[in-house]
Amino acid sequence: MIGFIGFGRTGKAVATAILENKEFSLEWVYRRKTLLENRSIAEFLGIESDEIGKLYSSEHTAVEDLLDKQPVDFIIDFSSSTGIYSYGKAAASRGVKIISAISHYAKEDIAFMKTLAKDTTVFWSPNITLGVNFLLLASKSLKKIAP
Protein backbone atom coordinates (compact mmCIF):
# COMPACT_ATOMS: atom_id res chain seq x y z
CA MET A 1 0.00 0.00 0.00
CA ILE A 2 1.42 3.31 -1.15
CA GLY A 3 0.73 6.96 -0.39
CA PHE A 4 1.99 9.92 -2.42
CA ILE A 5 3.03 13.33 -1.21
CA GLY A 6 2.82 15.87 -4.03
CA PHE A 7 1.42 15.24 -7.47
CA GLY A 8 3.37 17.01 -10.20
CA ARG A 9 4.22 15.69 -13.65
CA THR A 10 6.51 12.88 -12.47
CA GLY A 11 4.17 11.94 -9.62
CA LYS A 12 1.26 11.62 -12.02
CA ALA A 13 3.30 9.43 -14.36
CA VAL A 14 4.38 7.13 -11.52
CA ALA A 15 0.82 7.05 -10.13
CA THR A 16 -0.45 5.92 -13.53
CA ALA A 17 2.13 3.12 -13.62
CA ILE A 18 1.18 2.01 -10.10
CA LEU A 19 -2.55 2.06 -10.86
CA GLU A 20 -1.94 -0.08 -13.94
CA ASN A 21 -0.02 -2.67 -11.89
CA LYS A 22 -2.21 -5.05 -9.86
CA GLU A 23 0.66 -5.87 -7.47
CA PHE A 24 0.55 -2.39 -5.91
CA SER A 25 -2.16 -0.27 -4.38
CA LEU A 26 -2.11 3.53 -4.44
CA GLU A 27 -4.18 4.41 -1.37
CA TRP A 28 -4.00 8.19 -1.49
CA VAL A 29 -2.32 11.32 -2.80
CA TYR A 30 -1.72 14.11 -0.27
CA ARG A 31 -1.11 17.57 -1.69
CA ARG A 32 -1.60 21.27 -0.98
CA LYS A 33 -4.19 21.92 -3.68
CA THR A 34 -7.86 21.47 -2.86
CA LEU A 35 -8.92 21.14 -6.51
CA LEU A 36 -10.81 17.85 -7.00
CA GLU A 37 -10.21 16.86 -3.39
CA ASN A 38 -11.75 13.50 -2.41
CA ARG A 39 -11.95 12.46 -6.07
CA SER A 40 -10.62 9.16 -7.33
CA ILE A 41 -6.97 9.27 -8.37
CA ALA A 42 -7.71 7.08 -11.41
CA GLU A 43 -10.58 9.35 -12.44
CA PHE A 44 -8.36 12.43 -12.02
CA LEU A 45 -5.74 10.82 -14.26
CA GLY A 46 -8.35 9.68 -16.77
CA ILE A 47 -7.48 5.99 -16.58
CA GLU A 48 -9.54 2.91 -15.86
CA SER A 49 -8.67 1.21 -12.60
CA ASP A 50 -10.39 -0.65 -9.81
CA GLU A 51 -8.28 1.27 -7.28
CA ILE A 52 -10.27 3.44 -4.88
CA GLY A 53 -7.44 5.76 -3.80
CA LYS A 54 -8.39 9.41 -3.44
CA LEU A 55 -6.86 12.88 -3.48
CA TYR A 56 -6.53 14.66 -0.12
CA SER A 57 -5.56 18.24 0.65
CA SER A 58 -3.32 19.32 3.52
CA GLU A 59 -5.73 22.23 3.92
CA HIS A 60 -8.56 19.94 5.08
CA THR A 61 -6.85 16.74 6.27
CA ALA A 62 -4.05 16.40 8.82
CA VAL A 63 -1.38 13.96 7.68
CA GLU A 64 -1.56 12.19 11.05
CA ASP A 65 -5.28 11.53 10.54
CA LEU A 66 -4.67 10.26 7.02
CA LEU A 67 -1.92 7.89 8.18
CA ASP A 68 -4.13 6.58 11.00
CA LYS A 69 -7.31 6.17 8.94
CA GLN A 70 -5.66 4.94 5.74
CA PRO A 71 -2.31 3.44 6.72
CA VAL A 72 0.29 2.74 4.04
CA ASP A 73 3.55 0.81 3.91
CA PHE A 74 5.40 3.43 1.85
CA ILE A 75 5.20 7.12 1.12
CA ILE A 76 6.69 8.32 -2.14
CA ASP A 77 7.44 12.02 -1.95
CA PHE A 78 7.15 14.09 -5.13
CA SER A 79 6.61 17.42 -3.35
CA SER A 80 9.56 19.71 -2.59
CA SER A 81 12.65 19.76 -0.41
CA THR A 82 10.58 21.15 2.47
CA GLY A 83 7.76 18.61 2.06
CA ILE A 84 9.51 16.10 4.32
CA TYR A 85 8.82 18.39 7.29
CA SER A 86 5.06 18.18 6.75
CA TYR A 87 4.85 14.39 7.10
CA GLY A 88 8.26 12.99 8.07
CA LYS A 89 7.84 12.68 11.84
CA ALA A 90 4.29 11.33 11.54
CA ALA A 91 5.37 8.71 8.98
CA ALA A 92 8.52 7.68 10.85
CA SER A 93 6.71 7.30 14.18
CA ARG A 94 4.29 4.89 12.46
CA GLY A 95 7.06 2.92 10.74
CA VAL A 96 6.01 4.07 7.27
CA LYS A 97 8.93 3.81 4.84
CA ILE A 98 9.82 7.01 2.98
CA ILE A 99 11.02 7.15 -0.62
CA SER A 100 12.01 10.64 -1.69
CA ALA A 101 11.93 11.61 -5.37
CA ILE A 102 13.29 15.07 -4.59
CA SER A 103 16.43 15.91 -6.56
CA HIS A 104 18.11 18.30 -4.14
CA TYR A 105 18.11 18.78 -0.38
CA ALA A 106 20.01 21.26 1.76
CA LYS A 107 22.39 19.87 4.40
CA GLU A 108 19.87 20.50 7.18
CA ASP A 109 17.16 18.62 5.25
CA ILE A 110 19.48 15.63 4.84
CA ALA A 111 20.26 15.76 8.57
CA PHE A 112 16.52 15.72 9.30
CA MET A 113 16.07 12.66 7.07
CA LYS A 114 18.91 10.91 8.90
CA THR A 115 17.03 11.56 12.15
CA LEU A 116 13.88 10.01 10.63
CA ALA A 117 15.95 7.02 9.48
CA LYS A 118 16.45 6.04 13.12
CA ASP A 119 12.76 5.02 13.19
CA THR A 120 12.05 3.95 9.61
CA THR A 121 13.64 3.33 6.24
CA VAL A 122 14.36 6.53 4.31
CA PHE A 123 15.51 6.17 0.70
CA TRP A 124 16.78 9.15 -1.24
CA SER A 125 18.99 9.48 -4.27
CA PRO A 126 19.77 12.87 -5.83
CA ASN A 127 19.09 11.47 -9.30
CA ILE A 128 15.98 9.41 -8.49
CA THR A 129 13.70 11.58 -10.65
CA LEU A 130 15.98 11.05 -13.62
CA GLY A 131 15.93 7.30 -12.93
CA VAL A 132 12.15 7.22 -12.54
CA ASN A 133 11.68 9.11 -15.81
CA PHE A 134 14.04 6.69 -17.58
CA LEU A 135 12.13 3.67 -16.25
CA LEU A 136 8.80 5.17 -17.32
CA LEU A 137 10.12 5.86 -20.82
CA ALA A 138 11.62 2.37 -21.03
CA SER A 139 8.39 0.72 -19.89
CA LYS A 140 6.40 2.62 -22.55
CA SER A 141 8.85 1.50 -25.21
CA LEU A 142 8.72 -2.11 -24.02
CA LYS A 143 4.90 -2.07 -24.13
CA LYS A 144 5.12 -1.21 -27.83
CA ILE A 145 7.57 -4.04 -28.52
CA ALA A 146 6.08 -6.80 -26.35
CA PRO A 147 2.79 -8.43 -27.35
Residue ranges and their predicted role:
Residues K143-P147:
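Internal alpha-helical scaffold of NAD(P)-dependent oxidoreductase catalytic cores
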Residues T82-R94, A101-L142:
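Rossmann-fold NAD(P)-binding glycine/threonine-rich loop
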Residues D68-I75, A92-I98:
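Short acidic/histidine-rich motifs immediately flanking catalytic phosphotransfer sites
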Residues G46-D68, I76-T82:
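Glycine-rich, highly charged phosphate/nucleotide-binding loops
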Residues M1-G3:
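Extreme N-terminal starter segment of soluble prokaryotic enzymes
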Residues F7:
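Glycine-rich Rossmann-fold phosphate-binding loop(s) that bind the pyrophosphate
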Residues E20-E51:
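NAD(P)-binding Rossmann-fold cofactor-contacting core
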Residues G11-K12:
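N-terminal Rossmann-fold NAD(P) dinucleotide-binding loop
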